[in-house]
Amino acid sequence: MSVLSVRDLCKKYDQFELNKVSFELEPGTITGFIGRNGAGKTTTLKSLLNLVHPNSGEIVFFGKSYKENEFEIKQKIGFVAGGIDYYPKKKIKTITSTTRPFYKNWDEKAYKHYMDLFDLDENKTPDELSAGMKVKYSLVLALSHNAELLILDEPTSGLDPVSRDDLLDIFMGLSDEGITILFSTHITSDLDKCADNIIYIKNGKILASTDLTSFLAQYKVLELTDEELTDELKTKLIGCKKSKHGFSALIRATDSEKLDLAMSGADLESIVVRLEKE
């Protein structure tokens, strides 16, 4: 059974439309949710949290309709975002005491375990925490009510490379424990390291929803000289641009099979940047 199933989700605004968004999340997987600003990521996440009311479509968590089981479902969901500002002068233990009553499955033993694991001092205030430690505290709150699904909205934004890598290790460890993660981010290199699956949204439409390996295998990066960039080849290229030694472009793997040219595998950033300019 899927942890989350979204079917034909639509939301209309004056200048933007979320258009029949559909995808599924399988248990214990990390799914990267990518797309440029304004593509529909935030609207989708807010719809999942019932902060935005879609015009049509269906959202099913753990095999149950969201509309009819919202309270029960939210007991199993944790939301973590980068840049969350808690009461800056309140001690962490006070914030925890305020949060605890909202969850019927609050597990004090788990709370203490993750506070120790993440080396957090509950006598400190958010003002005394780094950005990375604030994200870890958000994770503690989510995991202390035994969340089975974590929805992450730019959790590594603004963090230094070491802190980001530390969090990615944590996410992968949680996935190994069976927790499902939906990871919305602009930092595609993070997803290269940890994602099992990718959802790519552009202009309110899902253009890809597949496993990461299959998504990357669909494209190659070509490095071309002026002489190699023929008019016929140009028709097959995606996001061709001038490079240090000639031209660089993306090409679909199916179009590259008979080409005797220098090419390499593509990472997420190479693919998304060029697809956005297509």
Locations of regions flagged by a protein language model:
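Conserved ABC transporter NBD signature motif
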Residues: 25, 57-68, 72-73
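ABC-family P-loop ATPase nucleotide-binding domains
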Residues: 75, 79-137
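Catalytic Walker B motif of ABC-type/P-loop ATPase nucleotide-binding domains
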Residues: 150-154, 159
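C-terminal coupling/interaction segments
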Residues: 237-278
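ABC transporter nucleotide-binding domain
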Residues: 167-251
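Walker A (P-loop) phosphate-binding loop of ABC-type ATPase nucleotide-binding domains
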Residues: 35-40
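Helix-to-loop junction immediately C-terminal to a conserved catalytic motif
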Residues: 49
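Conserved beta-strand
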Residues: 6-9, 16-26, 33, 57
